Amino acid sequence: MSIPFFSFSWVVMSNLTYLQGYPEQLLSQVRTLINEQRLGDVLAKRYPGTHDYATDKALWQYTQDLKNQFLRNAPPINKVMYDNKIHVLKNALGLHTAVSRVQGGKLKAKAEIRVATVFRNAPEPFLRMIVVHELAHLKEKEHNKAFYQLCCHMEPQYHQLEFDTRLWLTQLSLGQDKI
């Protein structure tokens, strides 16, 4: 009696974790790219190279520049950093937190943005999409229409970049080479 062989990529491909909620026609195209091992090539052609914001200091400056360009009246950001505790291949891509502390007789709020370390080696547009998303939470806490309108105001290609970032994460989860 022979046991059928199922490849790892078939199992992962069948559910496409990062692409849940997208139309089946689109998922079919992604499955074809994966089967033909062309997903990485397509992404590399569209997004050649990585960014130069590999340190926490550079990421902070990058985030501040975007905030100053689009959200001057938003509360200040006290900390921006890459965080290796964010398990991007399991849950979040970035985190925004508002930490409230008692200082003297007053309550002081501090905003923090943390980005998964996998984005240290990502193409710059993917990092921009994550930072824009987290910055939008300074004004809009929930993922609602106003939130996504703000994301699109800061990055007109936001939805395409989100999809392509999900493709890139799918590629990484399959163990294929990074761009």
Language-model region placement:
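Active-site-proximal or metal-binding-adjacent scaffold patches in catalytic folds
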Residues: 2-128, 138-179
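Walker B beta-strand of ABC/ABC-like P-loop ATPase nucleotide-binding domains
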Residues: 131
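Walker B catalytic acidic pair
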Residues: 134
